[in-house]
Amino acid sequence: MKIHKAWGKVAVAMSLLLLCPAIKAGGGSLTAEDIAKIRRVHSRYEETWLKGDADGVRALFTEDCVLLPPHGDKPRIGQKGLNEYWFPPGAPPTKITKLVVVPQSIGGDGETAYVWGTDEVAWTTTQDGKTTSASHKGIFLNVLKKQADGEWKISHHMWDEPVERH
């Protein structure tokens, strides 16, 4: 029993030693203004998709962004990868009809932030005169980077939806 307690104290001490330099180097904690701006990025994400504003969506992401699509699909790197995944040339017209993004937690330091939460999206696709609808509820994780102008942009975006249980 004493051995387990001793190892537990060692593990806590090692964790603190490893984390403290990373926390110190991070530039402090998020300010209330940072958190408000990060929330606004997520609101604009909803708004731009619902308006069908592809340029508005692109503007929310860094040039070197990484999209991590669901189900282990390959990562899409940079604005080029974002365009290939979400806005491929010649793809059938797709309209987002519902998008609700609900951040559950926001954390980070003065330069990098993370946000995780839930989302619900619905869309229609029209091809050969036929319109089909689809939707899902899921989860997301975003990493954001503070820009030189003080605004925040999404650098990494990961999302998934529940797996059907049989």
Cite the ranges covered by each PLM segment.
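Bacterial N-terminal signal peptides
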Residues: 11-22
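A solvent-exposed, acidic/Ser-Thr-rich amphipathic alpha-helical stretch
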Residues: 32-39, 54-109, 118, 132-135
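A short, structured loop/turn motif at beta-sheet edges
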Residues: 106-114, 144-151
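A short hydrophobic beta-strand element
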Residues: 111-123, 138
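Short beta-strand edge/turn micro-motifs at domain boundaries
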Residues: 137-165
